[in-house]
Amino acid sequence: MKEATITPFAKPLYIMTKPVGAVCNLACDYCYYLEKSKLYEEQPRHVMSDELLEKFIKEYIQSQTMPQVLFTWHGGETLMRPLVFYKKALELQKKYAGGRTIDNCIQTNGTLLTDEWCEFFRENNFLVGISIDGPQEFHDEYRKNKMGQPSFYKVMKGINLLKKHGVEWNAMAVVNDYNADYPLDFYRFFRDELDCHYIQFTPIVERLSNRADGLRLSSLKQKDGELASFSITPEQWGNFLCTIFDEWVLN
């Protein structure tokens, strides 16, 4: 692959990398990845091999036309790949950097974080995104493990480890039918209890299908399917954002 030329007016190319595919230690009710395993039951191809990792890193860097390159690691649950995988990724980034500045961000549910993981993230300047749906009563409604056990306390333990090691982190929160009507409780938890400076809110709207293969969630093209019970309405989403905006401006 011919290496791209760095230009001052170019736009960056971003690719979200999923080194474990849909594999996760949680089974959140609203997750659109819960059914992905059925797509590769006969021939699993969802875990990135070392060969594919090197090919991807080399070609991704060479395709960039800007001096900064951002790698975004996403899941499934990213920390279900061992630490050695990400150490290998950094080695390959250095090998193919070609004078470019390389940055990394990673999204995780936070339940598998340890001191060792956090030390690695801090030493290598990773930005860590934590998936957490607000206070315990909101978070644990849908974000449970595969045995139906709540995950809030493990996530909080992970956040405290990030703070302990001085890792830069932010939050990604799903707005669903259970928490959408409590925007101030939601927002103040992140601001006052977590001291979180950056929050991404994601509204959940999913349609159901009655497919013969047992898959529940419908495609984007199917616009007349029944809404999943955890979905929010346009009115809820608008009120949620406006209420938080007013609180943010005033306080």
Which residues does each PLM region occupy?
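Radical SAM enzyme [4Fe-4S]-AdoMet core and its adjacent flexible, acidic
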Residues: K146-Y153, N160, K164-N251
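Conserved radical SAM core fold
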Residues: S37-L39, G76-M80, G110-D115, L127-G148, ...
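Hydrophobic faces of well-ordered beta-strands that scaffold small-molecule active sites
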Residues: I15, V69-F71, N104-I106, V128-I130, ...
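Short, surface-exposed basic-aromatic patches at helix termini and helix-loop junctions that form
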Residues: E91, C118-N125, M147, R188-L194
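Conserved alpha-helical substructure of the radical SAM core
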Residues: K2-E119, E123-N124
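Short coil-to-beta-strand
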Residues: C24-Y32, N125-I130, L194-F201
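A generic secondary-structure signal
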Residues: K55, E59-S63, L92-K95, G158-L161, ...
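Alpha-helix N-cap and loop-to-helix initiation/capping positions
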Residues: P44-E51, R81-V84, R143-P150, I232-N239
